[in-house]
UniProtKB/Swiss-Prot annotation:
The active site is at C76, C224. PROSITE patterns: DAP_EPIMERASE. Pathway: Amino-acid biosynthesis; L-lysine biosynthesis via DAP pathway; DL-2,6-diaminopimelate from LL-2,6-diaminopimelate: step 1/1. It comes from Rhodopseudomonas palustris (strain HaA2). One of its GO terms (molecular function) is diaminopimelate epimerase activity. Catalyzes the stereoinversion of LL-2,6-diaminopimelate (L,L-DAP) to meso-diaminopimelate (meso-DAP), a precursor of L-lysine and an essential component of the bacterial peptidoglycan. Keywords: Amino-acid biosynthesis, Cytoplasm, Isomerase, Lysine biosynthesis. Homodimer. InterPro entries: DAP_epimerase_AS, DAP_epimerase_DapF. Belongs to the diaminopimelate epimerase family. It is found in: Cytoplasm. It is an enzyme of class 5 (isomerase). One of its GO terms (biological process) is lysine biosynthetic process via diaminopimelate. This is Diaminopimelate epimerase.
Length: 293
């Protein structure tokens, strides 16, 4: 028996990032990695957002995030906007606070109808915090490359943690590289002991970046909110952009602000409800991993 048997779910997307949201606040039973994989086989998604009972005063829920391969993620900005949209519906609330593995995240209604803003917290740049397998004093560009030493195909990525590890390769054309080929190699490179999200990014001007991402545990994605945050921050660290930028991803646009003062990263974008349904218990027959979520 699974905690997801007969549970209602919402299939959503955050500018193309495929999200499934399940409210389990009334049922604190464990959900397993096998359950998460079973859901992905039935309702394809990039991230599964599980709302579990709040553990801290002042929070709406503890949000556990699964990738479609059954691994867990500490943060998913697009998913949090989808969660916020669901909970704001039919409510006059202006803001919500959630707990995740990466810490507390605040969400509020955006500047226009259908937009939502998530405070993703402050980025981390220390090699131990990302984490990396060896010491790098300057994470604005680390020694890592794909291809021949004298003619690398991709090289010298910036690395950032937004609650999960990100590597950003700066390129002139984000479509000139087979990210489906290089993505899994770089995601699983030994330098990243917890694997990494891999992004190709092109700086158009000081207020605009285009990007594509191979998402850790999910693969090629039309949008990755935490990658957009990491990329915007990395570009600003290099002094190549301002601290407020428009990010163009395959699935749409996000506005990212790396706020002065507290260094928190604010992400604003849309969230759409595609359909709602109920899980058939037959999906979880054989999902026998008993690791509690």
């Amino acid at each position: 028996m699974s905690a997801l048997d007969n549970r209602l779910f919402a299939k959503m997307n955050g500018i193309g990032n495929e999200i499934v949201v399940v409210d389990l606040r009334d049922q604190p039973a464990p959900v397993t990695p096998d359950d998460a994989r079973a859901v992905a086989a039935h309702v394809p998604y990039d991230q599964l957002m599980l709302l579990q009972p709040a553990r801290l005063p002042g929070t709406e829920a503890f949000v556990r995030i699964y990738n479609n391969d059954g691994s867990e993620s500490g943060a998913c900005g697009n998913g949090m906007r989808c969660v916020a949209r669901q909970l704001f519906a039919g409510s006059d609330q202006q803001g919500l606070t959630f707990e995740t593995r990466a810490g507390l995240l605040n969400c509020w209604r955006g500047p226009a109808e259908g937009l939502f803003t998530v405070d993703m917290g402050a980025p981390k740049f220390g090699w131990q915090d990302i984490p990396l397998a060896e010491e790098f004093r300057d994470t604005r560009g680390i020694e890592l490359q794909i291809g021949p030493i004298d003619a690398p195909i991709l090289h010298t990525p910036s690395v950032v943690s937004m609650g999960n590890p990100h590597a950003i390769f700066w390129v002139d054309d984000i479509h000139a590289y087979d990210l489906g080929q290089f993505g899994p190699l770089l995601e699983n490179h030994p330098i990243f002991p917890e694997r990494a999200n891999i992004t190709l990014a092109h700086i158009v001007d000081r207020q605009h970046i285009t990007m594509r991402t191979w998402e850790r545990g999910a693969g090629l994605t039309r949008a990755c909110g935490s990658a957009a945050c990491a990329t915007a921050v990395a570009a600003a660290r290099l002094r190549r952009t301002d601290r407020i930028v428009e990010m163009t991803l395959p699935g749409g646009k996000l506005t990212i602000e790396w706020r002065e003062g507290d260094d928190h990263v604010l992400m604003t974008g849309g969230a759409e409800l595609e359909f709602e349904g109920r899980f058939d218990p037959a999906l979880f027959v054989g999902a026998c991993d008993t690791t509690a979520a």
